[in-house]
Amino acid sequence: MWTALPLLCAGAWLLSAGATAELTVNAIEKFHFTSWMKQHQKTYSSREYSHRLQVFANNWRKIQAHNQRNHTFKMGLNQFSDMSFAEIKHKYLWSEPQNCSATKSNYLRGTGPYPSSMDWRKKGNVVSPVKNQGACGSCWTFSTTGALESAVAIASGKMMTLAEQQLVDCAQNFNNHGCQGGLPSQAFEYILYNKGIMGEDSYPYIGKNGQCKFNPEKAVAFVKNVVNITLNDEAAMVEAVALYNPVSFAFEVTEDFMMYKSGVYSSNSCHKTPDKVNHAVLAVGYGEQNGLLYWIVKNSWGSNWGNNGYFLIERGKNMCGLAACASYPIPQV
């Protein structure tokens, strides 16, 4: 019944950080590394310190070089600044080529017109706080719960916090694989046929694979139907966000995205095909800035990443394949 689809955000937490060319680190870079270590409460062995300083200095230089050029977005230091992109891919992203083109559309697009901008965060208490997936490739679960939390709140006026850990532990029969990855569309199907998902207070997040502990008597949110938006139909995504609720989508994360800080993310290094997506997030709105169309997107790397846990990404160009497998749930309320 369920076609095999790719995994998102999969990957074990490996210790190798990838090779970094030896740098001559200057005093300014050492100062910023020391400050960054204090901010992020980092400690290292002597050997590890030397390696992490090298990686940090390399990332610092990339950030400075990027910000001096004419880009639509700025980079900044964050929790990833002592890691190479090779290490980040092992820890947070699925490193093999992916393909979500098997997702079958059932969305019927209207003719508009639609508002020039939309931000569900400004529509009352209908977008839950930014969460942090931590040391688990579970972005797909946070995209799923974020979409359903908003859909329920919009339909009923009740905001709740749903259990990502239930999806990590229990949704394997729908081609999801816990901390090794999955897709929101498949997670919505699981909730639909499982007849519910528990709240996070009853099924707290631990950020690692565990035994399924679902208790149907404690289910608090339910899915009536799952809507899969047509492959690469970004206009349909706009309609869905404008008229209905936030939309889950996947895209390809490349190195320049990891240090995103502000502005509208756009990249020439990512692919626009459905076979490369490796991270799932939640579109909560859209708009335009200086003639540049963008999506407002909720991430799952904590509120200290990006712009309070959010980022903007260019809209209308299928940037990094973001229109490859978008979906949202219709809640049963």
UniProtKB/Swiss-Prot annotation:
The record's disulfide annotation reads C100-C325, C136-C179, C170-C212, C270-C320
BP terms from Gene Ontology: adaptive immune response; bradykinin catabolic process; cellular response to thyroid hormone stimulus; dichotomous subdivision of terminal units involved in lung branching; ERK1 and ERK2 cascade; immune response; immune response-regulating signaling pathway; lysosomal protein catabolic process
User: What does UniProt list as catalytic?
Assistant: C139, H279, N299
SMART domains the UniProt entry points to: Inhibitor_I29, Pept_C1
Report whether DNA-binding shows up as a keyword of the record.
Answer: no
**Tell me, what does this protein do in biology?**
Important for the overall degradation of proteins in lysosomes.
Record-given protein name: Pro-cathepsin H
